Structure formats: structure tokens, C-alpha cells
Amino acid sequence: MKTLLLTMVVVTIVCLDLGYTLKCHNTQLPFIYKTCPEGKNLCFKATLKKFPLKFPVKRGCADNCPKNSALLKYVCCSSDKCN
């Protein structure tokens, strides 16, 4: 029984990412993503303000949420693949 418990603990440690890293989409395609570098704790998505369809023009990792501009609206989030 102790062996089974120890095995489960070892498998859990191996399977979990001990140093949490955020994964963000980094292209317009929603199924492609990258692991963010250390210190980049937010995902962002930029869309054109004046365009009727809210198609993302830029996605990626950020340390701070970028500020909206005259053309782009930024939305930020902090969970995996949330952008």
C-alpha cells in the first residue's frame, strides 16, 4: 500500500509542471500557442476597434496589459490559452 501511494506521488510530481508557466495563443489561429517566458503573466488579444467582426489581429504574452490605441482594443487574461 505504501508503495502504491509513493508511486502515485512520484507520478503526480512528474506530470505536474512544478514551475507554473502560462500558455498563450500567439497567432490569429486559435489552436497555436506558446509558453510565455518568465515574468510574462498575462495573455492579450488585440482587435480592430472599427471593424465589425472582432477578429484578433495580434495575440501573445505580456507583463502588463497593453493600452488601447485609436485602432486597437486590447483584452487581457491570466489563464492558459484564454486569449
UniProtKB/Swiss-Prot annotation:
Protein's cellular compartments: Secreted; Target cell membrane
Known tissue expression: Expressed by the venom gland.
One GO BP: killing of cells of another organism
Function: Has low cytotoxic activity.
Stated family: Belongs to the three-finger toxin family. Short-chain subfamily. Orphan group XV sub-subfamily.
Residues in the signal sequence: 1-21
Disulfide bonds: C24-C43, C36-C61, C65-C76, C77-C82
Superkingdom as given in the UniProt entry: Eukaryota
A molecular-function term among this protein's GO annotations: toxin activity
Ribonucleoprotein recorded as keyword: no
Protein name: Cytotoxin homolog 5
Broad class of the protein's primary localization: secreted
GO CC, one annotated term: extracellular region
Keyword Amino-acid biosynthesis belongs to the record: no
Keyword annotations of the record: Cytolysis, Disulfide bond, Hemolysis, Membrane, Secreted, Signal, Target cell membrane, Target membrane, Toxin
